[in-house]
Amino acid sequence: MTKALVTAHLKAFPMEQRKILELLRGQIAAELPTAKQVIKYGIPTFVVDGKPIIGFSGYKKHNSIFPYSGTVASVLKSELRNYEQTKGSIHFAIDKPFPRVLLRKILKAKFELMQQP
């Protein structure tokens, strides 16, 4: 699964939603310049050293970020209080970008959790 498959996946979304998802993709790529972009579990995912770091996708009523760790959301509980969540996802509006500052915090928390034994 390659970067081209991620691009193809995103082309399936309506233009306005696709713009938001492409922006998120670019921000994640800037934060994780060595990551590979793949499709994992049917969603675009950034992988570092063979480990999924963060995924994202769009849906009919929301977009989602998948930190591949339910613990990330609990670590950032207060920062994520305004976002609907499931055990493995953080939902955000279809028409509004996900805050880059919060994206950085999610990535930082993910890497810190990965360092724990």
Where are these regions (language model features)?
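Charge-dense, helix-prone N-terminal extensions
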Residues: 1-117
